[in-house]
Every structure is written in structure tokens, then in C-alpha cells.
Amino acid sequence: MSKAPSQPAKKWMSARTLAKSEDATNRKSNTAAPASQPSQQPASVMHERPTPPPPAPVQLPQSVFFERQEAVDTLSNLYRNAQSVKKIETGPAAFEARDISKVHEELMDCLRPAAAA
């Protein structure tokens, strides 16, 4: 004689699979509930998302590190410029020496046609 099992044998399921099946049954029960009950909120309120308040302006203190870094950068730029100026001054002259008033007149002559056009 064979004994008939009183309960059907349960198959082992992982926690993830159990959570999925519970989620699926909850979705089925949740989709059936709103159809039977009228919604309490108007449709426009249901579709609105709550907007967070705008962030308050924050005053950040100036960093000493960045101030120092700017000073170091400025000094190194001045040093490089001084070296390049020294090289230019000791090299041969690229242009003949001119009076500053003549240079100014030439610049103004170049700008006049552009302004008139």
C-alpha cells in the first residue's frame, strides 16, 4: 500500500523568487482594487509630482589654498614673462624705432574705414 501525501510537496524557492511572486500577486490585487473603488483624489493631483523647495544660496568661504595657488601662478607667470622680455630686448630689433604718435595715427587710420563701412 502506498501512502498518499496529505499535503502537496512544496518546491524550494529562493528569496528573490518569493519576493517576485509576492510582488506579482500584490500588483494583481492592487490593479483590481481601484477599479472597484472610486479614487479619492482628482486626476490632476494624482499626476503631480511634489517639487522640492529651491536650494538656499550658500556663502562659501574663500579657500586659502586657492589664494596661495593663484599667487604662485602669478609669480611664475611674471618670472616667465621677465625671462622672455629679457630675450627680446637682447635680440635684434624686429621693427625700426617709431614715435608713439605715428603708431597711434596709423591705428586710427586702420579703424576709420571699418567704422565707415
Swiss-Prot record:
Location of the protein in the cell = Cytoplasm
One GO BP annotation is: regulation of translation
KO phenotype (gene knockout): RNAi-mediated knockdown in the bloodstream form abolishes cell population growth.
Q: Where is the composition biased (Low complexity)?
A: 32-44
Q: Which GO terms describe its cellular component?
A: cytoplasm
Q: Where is this region: Disordered?
A: 1-60
Report whether DNA repair shows up as a keyword of the record.
no
Q: How is this protein named in the record?
A: PBP1-interacting protein XAC1
- Enumerate the UniProt keywords alphabetically: Cytoplasm, Translation regulation
Domain of life the protein comes from: Eukaryota
| UniProt function note | Involved in post-transcriptional regulation of gene expression.
| Main location per the UniProt record | cytoplasm
Which gene name does the record give? Answer: XAC1
Q: What subunit structure does UniProt give? A: Forms a complex composed of at least MKT1, PBP1, XAC1 and LSM12. Forms a complex composed of at least MKT1L, PBP1, XAC1 and LSM12.
The residues that cross the membrane are none
